[in-house]
């Protein structure tokens, strides 16, 4: 009898990292792969599913306008019980730190279904930064039986927390697997035509804890540097959150060196990252993606759960203070040595075989842990 492996995810970042795993698991004859999406993000989730040709078996469709964390939590918990009871999976795989991940793991705990946590062990140890993600992933870490840590540092965190080392597997990050299928040398886009021979600055900003004054500080710093550097052109695919859009309009509106565009598909996002001069972000996943292309990343957050990149030199944590962001952004444009030191640092996040390692583990096969250079 085939082992039933159910994957549950609901947001764009989860889908980017889980869809390659879905496709890998479906190649394994000993496994039956079932996909359930919660629809925590709707439009942005569907874009990724289409890119990787993944068709969900179940869709909870929980998203509604103006949804709160309470809405997401109760919506998933109420709807996923019936799916789990119908499928009766042998293991449920969740990813990272979203509300979908936390609530699904909680439902599995209530039904005593084993949980596999993909991208386990990331920590800031401040449950309000990032919020609510840090709490979510710590809570899932208590429940999970399989812990697929992307790096040695993530695995070490789990060991310090008392997890059984025999249930911790260092796999690399599945996002590196995803990028092997999305980046194209012959890629074209109207925004790249607009940038031309200039330096592309790729921007993302959306974090819940940065809403309000921190985001205004971030945008003001970016605009100041762009105003001083005519060789730079910035592209910012803006998040759907109306609070983010209002802040961007107030601080970046009318700046002819930045194009604020609607959310782009993962295929476009990865190709923009591969072609940028540098990236400013408060995203989690982009901290892993952009270093793979040898591009510096300024992380506009006070904490990061990805210290490997900071240690390796590919990431620089700059917080949300306007002057600090301005100074660091300006330095990377004006100091070639500083730029090269970040651009040439090694990528500590994976080799593109994380999904195969996870599949091997679920099949009970021997696996070779991922070891960074």
Label the predicted regions.
Residues 1-236, 241-373:
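Nucleotide-activated sugar donor-binding and catalytic core shared by glycosyltransferases
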């Amino acid at each position: 009898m085939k082992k039933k492996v159910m994957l549950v995810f609901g947001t764009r970042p989860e889908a980017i990292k889980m869809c390659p795993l879905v496709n890998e698991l479906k190649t394994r004859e000993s496994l039956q792969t079932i996909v359930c999406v919660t629809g925590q993000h709707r439009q942005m989730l569907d874009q990724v599913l289409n890119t990787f040709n993944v068709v969900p078996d179940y869709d909870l469709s929980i998203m509604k306008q103006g949804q709160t964390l309470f809405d997401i939590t109760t919506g998933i918990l109420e709807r996923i019980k019936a799916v789990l009871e119908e499928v009766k999976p042998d293991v449920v795989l969740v990813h990272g730190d979203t509300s979908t991940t936390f609530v699904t793991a909680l439902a599995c705990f209530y039904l005593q279904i084993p949980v596999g946590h993909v991208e386990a062990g990331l920590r800031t140890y401040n449950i309000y930064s990032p919020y609510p993600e840090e709490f979510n992933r710590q809570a899932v870490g208590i429940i999970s039986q399989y812990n697929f840590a992307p790096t040695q540092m993530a695995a070490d965190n789990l060991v310090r927390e008392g997890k059984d080392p025999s249930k911790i597997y260092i796999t690399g990050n599945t996002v590196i697997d995803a990028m092997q299928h999305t980046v194209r040398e012959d890629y074209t886009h109207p925004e790249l035509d607009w940038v031309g021979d200039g330096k592309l600055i790729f921007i993302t900003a959306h974090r819940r804890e940065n809403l309000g004054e921190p985001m205004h500080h971030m945008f003001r710093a970016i605009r100041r540097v762009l105003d001083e550097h005519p060789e730079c052109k910035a592209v910012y695919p803006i998040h759907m959150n109306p609070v983010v859009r209002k802040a961007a309009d107030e601080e970046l509106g009318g700046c002819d060196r930045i194009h604020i565009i609607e959310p782009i598909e993962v295929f476009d996002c990865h190709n923009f990252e591969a072609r940028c001069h540098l990236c400013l972000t408060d995203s989690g996943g982009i901290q892993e993606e952009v270093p793979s292309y040898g591009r510096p990343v300024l992380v506009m957050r006070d904490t990061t759960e990805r210290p490997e990149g900071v240690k390796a030199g590919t990431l620089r944590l700059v917080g949300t203070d306007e002057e600090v962001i301005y100074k660091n952004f300006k330095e990377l444009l004006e100091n070639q040595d500083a730029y090269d030191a970040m651009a040439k640092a090694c990528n500590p996040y994976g080799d593109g075989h994380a999904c195969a390692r996870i599949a091997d583990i679920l099949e009970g096969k021997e696996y070779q842990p991922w070891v960074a250079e």
